[in-house]
């Protein structure tokens, strides 16, 4: 049986850990609220962008922009959105499991058939350590990323499709549903499907100058990059929700462990006192 000193040391150590996890839970809660606000504030812009793309592409059945054209797939690009820090529950593991399974299924891990652009140190370290074909990365992204801060990697992803280096581009990220629920999504960004640019648009009665093809040349890359930015904002909310849940569970588990250790400590202390009393009584009896 552990000594009283050992048990007391474990209780104190667990209490300190509990204080840390509780503080991290509170920080994640605050960051989650800001991340949700950022994601929600981006929705109106994304809706307007979708309307513009639908108005131009949907009404132009002869649109011949490369980003709308399917072609034989020789190489596939994957944009993987993870985070820089751990202690976020299954957040990173689920995303990485999703993308590695798809790479195995589609390419049998042949590096000539795919390339990965990764956001987040956890994803980068994981994929590099396992010799996946990582061709670009962003590390150290802010909790409230600006469009400018992700411009390099989003532009790289889109331009590699435009130049033919990638024949299709997928994005893997965690979609925020609620504090307790997040889902890993795989979204095909490029080529943009005809269904995605078809349908009704609030801008359908507008006139476009100089012409729709010229506007498509500008707006389609912006649209694809906006999809990436929206997924990053969504992923940030998922990250903080997952970390908040993980820290709450850790705090609750620490409390249970402290209760168990306290009970164990009291029993050991009671046994020690009983032993001392027995020895005193036995010694007194021996003197009679």
UniProtKB/Swiss-Prot annotation:
Lineage top rank: taxon: Bacteria
Gene3D superfamilies given in the database record: 3.40.1380.10, ATP synthase, gamma subunit, helix hairpin domain
Keywords: ATP synthesis, Cell membrane, CF(1), Hydrogen ion transport, Ion transport, Membrane, Transport
Biological process terms in GO annotation: proton motive force-driven plasma membrane ATP synthesis
SUPFAM superfamilies per the UniProt record, alphabetical: ATP synthase (F1-ATPase), gamma subunit
Subcellular location: Cell membrane
Membrane-related topology note: Peripheral membrane protein
Gene Ontology cellular component annotations, sorted alphabetically: plasma membrane; proton-transporting ATP synthase complex
Single GO MF annotation: proton-transporting ATP synthase activity, rotational mechanism
Subunit structure and binding partners: F-type ATPases have 2 components, CF(1) - the catalytic core - and CF(0) - the membrane proton channel. CF(1) has five subunits: alpha(3), beta(3), gamma(1), delta(1), epsilon(1). CF(0) has three main subunits: a, b and c.
Entry function: Produces ATP from ADP in the presence of a proton gradient across the membrane. The gamma chain is believed to be important in regulating ATPase activity and the flow of protons through the CF(0) complex.
HAMAP family registered for this protein in UniProt: ATP_synth_gamma_bact (MF_00815)
Family classification: Belongs to the ATPase gamma chain family.
Official protein name in the record: ATP synthase gamma chain
Species the sequence originates in: Macrococcus caseolyticus (strain JCSC5402) (Macrococcoides caseolyticum)
Gene assigned in the entry: atpG
